[in-house]
Amino acid sequence: MYVRHFGLRDFRSWDHVDLELNPGRTVFFGPNGNGKTNLIEALWYSTTLSSHRVGTDIPLIRAGTIRAIVSTIVVNEGRECAIDLEIAAGRANRARLNRSLVRGMREVVGVLRAVLFAPEDLALVCGDPANRRRYLDDLATVRQPVIAAVRADYDKVLRQRTALLKSLAAARYRSDQGVLDTLDVWDTRLAEHGAELMAARIDLVNQLAPEVEKAYQLLAPGSRTASISYRASLDIGGIAGVGSSDRALLQADLLAGLSTRRNVELERGICLVGPHRDELELRLGDQPAKGFASHGESWSLAIALRLAAYELLRADGNEPVLLLDDVFAELDAARCRALATVAESAEQVLVTSAAQEDIPVGWDAKWVTVDLRDSDSGRVSVVYP
């Protein structure tokens, strides 16, 4: 798989750009702040419908405009597929697949498969659990686009149940059986959708675990063994062995957990049980990585998580596009060599760099210079092949 054409309109610092790309390696080169990362961000948005840098879409729209357009033509086993995404301010986003408007944005997920390596990846190890949950959900969605609907359904139920809990906490309606019956309905829905999301995550972690261990040893030979596991907000024994076929068990456990913690949830007005509170645990040896790993170990583990994702996508039968956003500048020589070795086998690698010396020696790559110029609407990014 590779991206043959890539176009932007009013995305971040770009008023417009059209790039013809080829298999192999392309380096987007230029000083920091010129808009290189914005290119990678747009490609990642085409993969996951989300940015790796911000949690909302509004910052993606160039200042002074009302919408951004991201267009890609993806070639997969000789067949082309065009994706056009319209990111709008004040109304719903829209997507086209092969120029035809689709009913929902999620229909384009999975057309472009990519793995992103970025400086923000350090948060996978050192940051909040939400970063690690998002890593799992993004990968699960790229591999199985139907998971996007599962996530959306769960998030919707979670918002509605949380709103009900807050109203109950404020109004103290606990003696109103009708209101409590309504909460029972939302408990059932949360358990149903939550079990489906948990099952997908647990199955994914079981597949990722051996790949993470291998990738970490490649990056840090002789170091402590890296391991990952899924820790639920419920006390489920042997959860590492729970797969998608155990959805009924997970649903029953979620319902039991919601019942047990109902009084506390009513007191606090928040939902305390469900996959939105689960954790992907990362360990080096017998210690948790967060708080105990060195800076170098943390980087190695973060890259190992991305390499593991890359290997799973390859095993699915489609070679993913590798997106490397200034990561060589963050790594020491040994880790650079290890990552470069993996990248050499990829069908397409798109790299950003502010310094030529950060790119591995001997790489045969097309270089594209990214610069800034003045326009009537302010400074905008441009490319010089």
From Swiss-Prot:
One cellular component term from this protein's GO annotations in UniProt: cytoplasm
GO MF annotations, alphabetized: ATP binding; single-stranded DNA binding
GO biological process entries: DNA replication; DNA synthesis involved in DNA repair; double-strand break repair; SOS response
Nucleotide-binding listed as a keyword: yes
Annotated Pfam families: SMC_N (PF02463)
Transmembrane segments: none
Keywords, ordered alphabetically: ATP-binding, Cytoplasm, DNA damage, DNA repair, DNA replication, DNA-binding, Nucleotide-binding, SOS response
Location of this chain's protein in the cell: Cytoplasm
Annotated ATP binding sites: G30, P31, N32, G33, N34, G35, K36, T37
UniProt xrefs under InterPro entries: DNA-binding_RecF, DNA-binding_RecF_CS, P-loop_NTPase, RecF/RecN/SMC_N, RecF_2
Stored PANTHER family: DNA REPLICATION AND REPAIR PROTEIN RECF
Record function comment: The RecF protein is involved in DNA metabolism; it is required for DNA replication and normal SOS inducibility. RecF binds preferentially to single-stranded, linear DNA. It also seems to bind ATP.
Protein family per UniProt: Belongs to the RecF family.
Protein name stated in the entry: DNA replication and repair protein RecF
